[in-house]
Amino acid sequence: MKNLIYQYWDGDTSRPGVIAGVKAMKKYAEKIGAEYLFEDNPRYYTHLGPYSPHYGQFKLIHEEKFSDYDHIMFADTDVFPVEKLEKSIFDDLTADIGICAEGWMTKNKGKTPAESYNPICRDADEVWAAKLEQRFGVKFPRCEETNHLMMYNSGMVVYNNKGLKEAKQKFMQYEDYIRTISPCASFYTCDQPYLHAQLIIKDINWQ
């Protein structure tokens, strides 16, 4: 198996948090026999507004040099492996793309901007999802306990080779996605809601 852990940072890479995160993830890659790649200021996207740096994680979908890996994990530099972890993250992937649910946020996010202390709230989530459901004829997953929309975190995403290829073929153009959800709050134009949406509307095999 040819596996890769990929990280990047657009900005000041001398920040202690970046240095620590990269060091820890590189060590973990060595433990599980995976290749490791950190890119210093690749600035892959620069035309998507303030969230351009966030979309850099999708470089691994589009660039040919990543296409021959069996598995790739993207992780933000503030993601740390559990201390002394020996098990490979790739062993637990049973679908084509793996992503983590935002369990606490799904259940506890405020309903309104006043309750959330910012524009990212359950009411705004509903507007965002409704725009995509109306256009694509899909239903977004909901928490069985609260019926709130499920939220997913794009800070760590695992792909197998099929998942990489399907993402390249099926994912919306970023500009089209941003137009579709307009005029949602700016957060909904970033990589996390974008990836969440693609997994649902493009019928990807994900977990």
Name the predicted role of every residue range.
Residues 58, 123-143:
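Short acidic (Asp/Glu) patches
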Residues 81-130:
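Conserved donor-nucleotide/metal-binding helix-loop-beta segment in metal-dependent transferases, i.e.
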Residues 135-207:
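Catalytic core and acceptor-binding pocket of nucleotide-sugar-dependent glycosyltransferases
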